[in-house]
Amino acid sequence: MEAEESEKAATEQEPLEGTEQTLDAEEEQEESEEAACGSKKRVVPGIVYLGHIPPRFRPLHVRNLLSAYGEVGRVFFQAEDRFVRRKKKAAAAAGGKKRSYTKDYTEGWVEFRDKRIAKRVAASLHNTPMGARRRSPFRYDLWNLKYLHRFTWSHLSEHLAFERQVRRQRLRAEVAQAKRETDFYLQSVERGQRFLAADGDPARPDGSWTFAQRPTEQELRARKAARPGGRERARLATAQDKARSNKGLLARIFGAPPPSESMEGPSLVRDS
């Protein structure tokens, strides 16, 4: 009897263990599916580019206007060039305007927490009025929005760092060029002052200057002849010059063709 009861207990435990294993497997599968769904639903930020920014339009304005469509993250506006800023400041100072000069921006980038909202905003608000109210100062300005596909904020940071580095290198090159021009001018002035001082020097009564000129052909031949083994070459060169001059003189006297033509004539006759 005891053996039969033990066999029954063993047979009852086996299906229980099988059901527990199946439940564990189902729970693990559900957890993996939830993790996969969570990874699919992960929010990816998107960036919208602003190609036109009206005067006196600030990041706070764009944040307030676009926050109605979705959560806005980081906002960056590119300031106008320093040269343009100086010209505007000078014009404002010359015109005697009551309002002081305010810095303006040329372009901007807005980050949305969800790229789907960024796409929707760029597609729906493009070429529409910025201000909805009649008294809004930006009512007659239009949105110029473009969604940047696969563009992240790190790309923008790298791009801005690259532009900053290029600007610094250009500034260094301009400063170096200006320094070279200034040094050359100062050297020229000092040289002229030395010349003027030397003109009134009593050690030079004539006040004449001597300048080194390039050696002539005769001087070069004389130098070559002075070298070991150069006399023979000089003699050969002079002999060749004399022969050429004699041939040219005979050709002028007798009306004969030059040596090159006289050599080509018989060859043509033979060929014919």
Curated annotation (Swiss-Prot):
Residues 1-38, 198-272 are annotated as: Disordered. One of its GO terms (biological process) is regulation of transcription by RNA polymerase II. It is found in: Nucleus; Nucleus, Nucleolus. GO terms for cellular component: nucleolus; nucleus; transcription regulator complex. The modification N-acetylmethionine is found at residue 1. Keywords: Acetylation, Coiled coil, DNA-binding, Nucleus, RNA-binding, Transcription, Transcription regulation. It comes from the Eukaryota. Residues 1-11 have a biased composition (Basic and acidic residues). CDD domains: RRM_ABT1_like. Residues 46-142 form the RRM domain. Residues 161-191 form a coiled coil. GO terms for molecular function: DNA binding; RNA binding; transcription coactivator activity. Gene3D superfamilies: 3.30.70.330. Residues 23-34 have a biased composition (Acidic residues). SUPFAM superfamilies: RNA-binding domain, RBD. Interacts with ESF1/ABTAP. Interacts with IGHMBP2. Could be a novel TATA-binding protein (TBP) which can function as a basal transcription activator. Can act as a regulator of basal transcription for class II genes. Belongs to the ESF2/ABP1 family. This is Activator of basal transcription 1. The lineage of its organism: Eukaryota, Metazoa, Chordata, Craniata, Vertebrata.
